[in-house]
Design a protein with these regions (language model features):
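Short intrinsically disordered terminal tails
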Residues: 1-2, 47, 113-124
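Short terminal alpha-helical segments
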Residues: 1-48
Length: 124
């Protein structure tokens, strides 16, 4: 769980960095991290089935984020959303658009919160 927490902090900081180049965000570094944590790239199908448009729309994610408690599901959604920009988007630079950045920041913040909560509970 500590590795998931560190992943969420690391990538949250990257997405918050106003000076980061899009290549750093769409290069395979995130994929390597996600795969090593056991997250699955499923084109956001599982997350979309449960949360609909929140799988790729920031405003929808804002409305349901507190309902998200499944760490592997959220991690896989982050991985799959990243893969869209890495592989399918017209331009990988779209990942830098404010609404896309905001989606990742919100999802990563929730992942950080859930993993930290899990770490604390396991220490009790």
């Amino acid at each position: 769980m500590k590795q998931i927490y560190e992943f969420a902090v690391k990538w949250g900081e990257k997405f918050r960095d106003p000076n980061i180049g899009y290549i750093e965000l769409v290069d395979d570094y995130m994929a390597d991290d996600c795969a090593s944590l056991g997250f699955k790239m499923d084109c956001v199908h599982a997350f979309s089935e449960k949360y609909g448009e929140a799988s790729n729309k920031h405003d929808a994610l804002v409305r349901i984020i507190d309902e998200v408690t499944d760490i592997p599901l959220l991690g896989s959604a982050i991985y799959s959303q990243w893969r869209y920009f890495n592989h399918w988007a017209y331009s990988g630079a779209e990942i830098l658009h404010p609404e896309n950045r905001a989606w990742f920041i919100l999802a990563l913040d929730r992942l950080e919160y859930l993993s930290r909560k899990n770490i604390v509970q396991s220490q009790l």
